[in-house]
């Protein structure tokens, strides 16, 4: 149930009947103040101006043609030409009851699309660090949301599994007689990487062997491929442990690394040359883009093949877009990476489109995000200035949550306490990130994210358990509750009912824009509205049984909505806290 969408369609139709053209937009928005209705149509004045009409007179014509008697109990013209829409309580009760009986809380499946979501993307032979957190959890929340909306989601973990570093690693493993790479742990690989790089820089014979191994690896040499595959497998097994701890849905089956596209690169570059898009410059192949200018004001050159024959990230990203359209048959491809890659992605996709590899109908979307900062406003690091490993961050989250929960509640069993600590600790880290607009930088603050006050995971998880506790105090059969009539008389009941029915608006926005913070804001508002409802409208002590059952229905849908919303964010809930 998307109230905004329904009202938009109906008001737009009335505007067209009143004389506006087909391209008009009703601009339906949720009202900020009750006296201005539940929703407002803000597009009347622009349409009236186009027609050369008085906005209020045109607004009246729109009302005369509006078919809203079932949804709205009152429509009024306000100010210079706004239309205030007051929803019908009878319609609200019908829709609330329908949402309660629907498996997806009343959210209907949209026109199904195949959507590729490229997220997380760590590097092979290195441990995940805090820099991977945002892409991993934001991308996963959007993937969950799009699946919930009925789309076919293909997760693409675009891992860095190709390049000269593998020649170094294979050569050094051989030097140290560590052919049994499968027995190694990732921490060993990180140390190996440092030593391999040192040897590569200081020992020309070693460097030559490493370069030879790169060539052999790229040409399919069985020994090199076997060693490379072991390095990839060890890395992804370790990364899977992080994904599981984060309650992220990525698996090893979702790995679509750079190596997947490697066989495509020579033919793509050759085709770009044939089309006249790629031209030679100092031995390299370059595509010049008029849409981007260099510091001299000339078209910017984007290298797609180096003079030594090597390919670049741009070439790989062109291949990835082509593959996702041609092979995966996707309608949309979303890439979650930081803002610093924005120009790179724009250029790669511009070349992709100029070459005709994807049609205009194929949506390529860079969902960029800002940086995670420390309290000093600088990139989040260890005290000594080093990179923070993701596993260490999650360990600290559990340690801090353990202290917090032990202080708050000693009435939980050990198993219950363990579940709460994990849900709160990991949930706090994720929610602190997801609740911020992804395009902005944000400050990582343990105290804020673990607070039981404000827009935090602990507050949301506690709000859920409070509602669960209401139902733990009653033995009402769920079937009987669903069959009971719902009445909406009190203003607090009405406000809660409307907010519950706005769930789909938030979810659709996340699916369209890739902005989980919109869902976080919605859930936080819902929890606050329920708290106000709970204080002013007795539930278990209601004046009669019918009101009690009616309010329990509102409480039940709130519980279900909070749980579903947090699940879409990848945040666990618990029954007791």
UniProtKB/Swiss-Prot annotation:
EC code: 6.1.1.19
SMART domains assigned: Arg_tRNA_synt_N, DALR_1
Disulfide bonds: none
Gene Ontology CC annotation, any one: cytoplasm
Catalytic reactions on record: tRNA(Arg) + L-arginine + ATP = L-arginyl-tRNA(Arg) + AMP + diphosphate
Matches recorded under Pfam families: Arg_tRNA_synt_N (PF03485), DALR_1 (PF05746), tRNA-synt_1d (PF00750)
Residues that span the membrane, as ranges: none
Secretion signal, residue range per the UniProt entry: none
Gene Ontology MF terms: arginine-tRNA ligase activity; ATP binding
GO biological process: arginyl-tRNA aminoacylation
Localization annotation: Cytoplasm
Name of the protein in its database record: Arginine--tRNA ligase
């Amino acid at each position: 149930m998307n109230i905004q969408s329904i009202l938009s369609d109906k008001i737009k139709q009335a505007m067209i009947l009143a004389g506006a053209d087909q391209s008009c937009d009703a601009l339906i928005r949720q009202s900020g103040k009750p006296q201005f209705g539940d929703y407002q149509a803000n597009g009347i004045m622009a349409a009236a101006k186009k027609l050369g009409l008085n906005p209020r007179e045109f607004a009246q014509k729109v009302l005369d043609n509006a078919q809203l008697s079932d949804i709205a109990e009152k429509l009024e013209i306000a100010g210079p030409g706004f239309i205030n829409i007051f929803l019908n309580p009878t319609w609200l009760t019908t829709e609330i009851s329908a949402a309660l009986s629907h498996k997806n809380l009343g959210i209907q499946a949209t026109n199904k699309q195949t959507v590729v979501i490229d997220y997380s993307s760590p590097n092979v032979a290195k441990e995940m660090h805090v820099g991977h957190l945002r892409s991993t959890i934001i991308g996963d929340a959007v993937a969950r949301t799009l699946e919930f909306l009925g789309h076919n989601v293909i997760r693409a973990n675009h891992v860095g599994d190709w390049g000269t570093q593998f020649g170094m690693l294979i050569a050094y493993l051989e030097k140290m007689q560590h052919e049994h790479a499968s027995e190694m742990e990732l921490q060993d690989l990180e140390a190996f990487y440092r030593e391999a790089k040192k040897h590569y820089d200081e020992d020309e014979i070693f460097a030559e062997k490493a370069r030879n191994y790169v060539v052999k690896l790229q040409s399919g040499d069985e020994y090199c491929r076997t060693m490379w595959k072991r390095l990839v497998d060890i890395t992804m097994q370790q990364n899977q442990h992080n994904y599981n701890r984060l309650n992220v849905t990525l698996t090893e089956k979702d790995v679509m690394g750079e190596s997947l596209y490697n066989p495509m690169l020579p033919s793509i570059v050759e085709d770009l040359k044939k089309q006249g898009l790629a031209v030679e410059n100092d031995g390299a192949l370059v595509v010049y883009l008029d849409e981007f200018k260099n510091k001299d004001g000339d078209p910017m050159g984007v290298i797609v093949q180096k003079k030594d024959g090597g390919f670049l990230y741009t070439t790989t990203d062109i291949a990835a877009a082509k593959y996702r359209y041609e092979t995966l048959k996707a309608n949309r491809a979303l890439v979650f990476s930081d803002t610093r890659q924005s120009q790179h992605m724009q250029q790669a996709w511009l070349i992709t489109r100029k070459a005709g590899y994807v049609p205009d109908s194929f949506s390529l979307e860079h969902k960029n995000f800002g940086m995670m900062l420390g309290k000093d406003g600088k990139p989040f690091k260890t005290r000594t200035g080093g990179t923070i490993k993701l596993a260490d961050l999650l360990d600290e989250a559990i340690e801090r949550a353990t202290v917090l929960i032990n202080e708050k509640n000693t009435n939980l069993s050990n198993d219950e306490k363990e579940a709460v600590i994990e849900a709160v600790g990991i949930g706090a880290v994720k929610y602190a990130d997801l609740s911020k607009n992804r395009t902005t930088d944000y400050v990582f603050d343990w105290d804020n994210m673990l607070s039981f006050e404000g827009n935090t995971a602990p507050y949301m998880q506690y709000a859920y358990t409070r509602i669960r506790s209401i139902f733990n105090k009653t033995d009402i059969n769920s079937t009987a509750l669903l069959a009971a009539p719902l009445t909406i008389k009190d203003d607090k009941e009405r406000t809660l009912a409307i907010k519950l029915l706005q769930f789909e608006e938030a979810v659709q926005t996340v699916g369209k824009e890739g902005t989980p913070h919109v869902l976080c804001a919605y859930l936080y508002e819902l929890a606050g509205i329920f708290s106000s409802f709970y204080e002013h409208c007795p539930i278990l002590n209601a004046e009669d049984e019918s009101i009690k059952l009616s309010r329990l229905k509102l409480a039940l849908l709130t519980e279900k909505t909070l749980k579903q919303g947090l699940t879409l964010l990848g945040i666990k809930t618990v029954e007791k806290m």
